[in-house]
Amino acid sequence: MNNKTFLEEFINYSNQIFPAIDSSVRNSIKEALRQFDINKFSWFSTVDLGGVCQGDILNKIPFTFQEEDGKSYAFPTKAMVISNSCDIENDKYILLAPLIPYLDTDEFDENQKRDLLNNKYNGKMCLSYSSVGNYYIDFSRIQSFNKNLIVNLINSNKIKLEYSLSQFGWYFLLTKMTIHFMRVEDHKLFSTRLKGA
């Protein structure tokens, strides 16, 4: 898949997930997305954004995952900053999502790996065809960390801020998070909620 095809897929994907939006608004969104220069398409910004921002990728964060039997284990990996940039300034804690390597694992078959690469899963995001394209961001494993600890580790070079998202990458992140966290529930469940009101 080349950049042009990927951009077209993203445009169609965005329109599918917001079906209730008026068609004229959808068309204007389509046109706005087409303004991205596909010859310069990049997930990452070449400009320093001046601090920790939403969508930044950090090189090594000690996540803790839990197994079915209740046992926990450490999983040091790259992380994406999920907290809104304004919240990062004001809050004591920062939300980070782990980047999970998936190419060298038997967790996914080849079709599932292709679907990950093409961003077909709601709760996962892949920065396809990039230097971190062999990872996916897992929105179901977001964890909270002390902001000052993270900032101090960056300032002391114990953690490296590897990448900041470009405008395109940031819009894509917002789209994926909107789908995962704010999509409408199935009709039956929604109707049941209404009965209990």
Residue spans for each PLM region:
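C-terminal terminal-subdomain/extension
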Residues: M1-G51, F65-A74, E107-A197
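Pocket-edge structural micro-motifs
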Residues: P62, P98, R141
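Short acidic, S/G/P-rich loop/turn micro-motifs used as interaction or catalytic elements
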Residues: F63-E67, C86-E89
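Compact nucleic-acid interaction/catalytic patches
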Residues: S72-K120
